[in-house]
Swiss-Prot record:
This is tRNA-cytidine(32) 2-sulfurtransferase. InterPro entries: Rossmann-like_a/b/a_fold, TilS/TtcA_N, tRNA_Cyd_32_2_STrfase, tRNA_thiolation_TtcA_Ctu1. Signal peptide: none annotated. The thiolation reaction likely consists of two steps: a first activation step by ATP to form an adenylated intermediate of the target base of tRNA, and a second nucleophilic substitution step of the sulfur (S) atom supplied by the hydrosulfide attached to the Fe-S cluster. The gene is ttcA. Gene3D superfamilies: HUPs. NCBIfam families: PRK10696.1.
Length: 302
C-alpha cells in the first residue's frame, strides 16, 4: 500500500513513522529497556501492535548505538482456522530470526472453561507460561510485548473502577516466574497511530477471535469511554497519560507511599503545599504536548 500513496499521504505517513520510532526510542531510553548484548524475544501475536513493534525494533536496531539481537516468536495455539503459513512466510521475507511454538492450549481451555464463559484468563496464563519457557530456551534476556499507551490507560481505569487500585501496566517488570525481564516498547505509542501504520504497511493481520471468545466486557466499556472522551474533549487522553508520569504521593492518600504521620509545623512546605481554604486552581484546557514531528520537516519515505 505504501507505493500507492500520493505525495501528501506519503508525507503524512513519513511523519507518523518518525513519530512512532521516536516514541519507541524514548520509552527504551526512559526505562532502560534494551542494553548492550541483549537478545530480545519479540512476541508476535499476528495483530497490528506486535507487527508494528517488530517492524520498529528492526528499524531501530539498524541504527542503534548498541548491539542487540531480535528473535520473533509466535505461539500457535491450534485454534481452528489459524492460518499457520502466514507468519512463517512473512517473517522469512523480513530476514529476522523467528520461532513458531506449537502448543495445543485451545483444547485445554475448551475442556476446562464452561461453554459461554470467556476463555481469555486461562488462555493468557497458559500462553504466558509457554512464552516464559521459550525465552529461557532461546537464551533471551528480555521479552517484548506489544501493549501501547491506550492499553496502559485502559488498565489504569479498570483497576480504579473495578479493583480499587491506582495501578496500571508497568513499562518494564520481572516476570512472575522471576526468570525474565518483560518490556513494553510501545508504551508511548497511540493506538490510532498504530492502526494507521499497520494499514499502510499492509501487515498480514490474523484475527484475534479465532477461538470464538469475546474481549473482556469491562475493558470494552473502558475503551468506549475513552474513545468518547477523546471525541468530546480533545487532548484529555494525552493529559491523563502525562498525569501517570508525574505522580505526587504527598497529595494522595496512600500512607504506605508517604509518611503523613510525621508531618508537623516544622516539616516545611511539601510539594508546593496546598491552599487548604481555596478552591483548587485547575487549567480550563488540557495540557497538550505539541508533537515536534508535526512542525518539523521530515525525510521522504523510500
Amino acid at each position: 500500500m505504501l507505493e500507492e500513496l500520493n505525495a501528501k499521504d506519503k508525507y503524512s505517513f513519513n511523519k507518523l513513522q518518525k513519530r512512532l520510532r521516536r516514541n519507541v526510542g524514548q520509552a527504551i531510553a526512559d526505562f532502560n529497556m534494551i542494553e548492550e548484548g541483549d537478545k530480545i524475544m519479540v512476541c508476535l501475536s499476528g495483530g497490528k501492535d506486535s507487527f508494528a513493534m517488530l517492524d520498529i525494533l528492526m528499524s531501530l536496531k539498524a541504527s542503534a548505538p548498541i548491539h542487540f539481537d531480535l528473535v520473533a516468536v509466535n505461539l500457535d495455539q491450534k485454534q481452528p482456522g489459524f492460518p499457520e503459513h502466514v507468519l512463517p512466510e512473512y517473517l522469512a521475507t523480513l530476514g529476522v530470526d523467528f520461532k513458531i511454538v506449537e502448543e495445543d492450549t485451545y483444547s485445554i481451555v475448551k475442556d476446562k472453561v464452561p461453554e459461554g464463559k470467556t476463555t481469555c484468563a486461562l488462555c493468557s496464563r497458559l500462553r504466558r507460561g509457554i512464552l516464559y519457557r521459550t525465552a529461557q530456551e532461546l537464551g533471551c534476556t528480555k521479552i517484548a510485548l506489544g501493549h501501547h499507551r491506550d492499553d496502559i490507560l485502559e488498565t489504569l481505569f479498570l483497576n480504579m473502577f473495578y479493583g480499587g487500585k491506582l495501578k496500571s501496566m508497568p513499562p518494564k517488570l520481572v516476570s512472575d516466574d522471576g526468570k525474565n525481564v518483560v518490556i513494553r516498547p510501545l508504551a508511548y505509542c497511540k493506538e490510532k497511530d498504530l492502526v494507521r501504520y499497520a494499514e499502510v504497511k499492509a501487515f498480514p493481520i490474523i484475527p484475534c477471535n479465532l477461538c470464538g471468545s469475546q474481549e473482556n466486557l469491562q475493558r470494552q466499556a473502558i475503551k468506549q469511554m475513552m474513545q468518547d472522551w477523546d471525541r468530546r474533549f480533545p487532548g484529555r487522553i494525552e493529559t491523563m497519560f502525562t498525569a501517570i508520569q508525574d505522580v505526587i504521593p504527598s497529595h494522595l492518600l496512600d500512607h504506605k507511599l508517604f509518611d503523613f504521620k510525621s508531618i508537623n509545623r516544622d516539616s516545611g512546605i511539601i510539594d508546593g503545599g496546598d491552599k487548604a481554604f481555596d478552591p483548587p486552581e485547575l487549567p480550563t484546557a488540557p495540557l497538550l504536548n505539541i508533537d515536534e514531528m508535526d512542525v518539523l520537516d521530515v525525510i521522504e519515505v523510500r
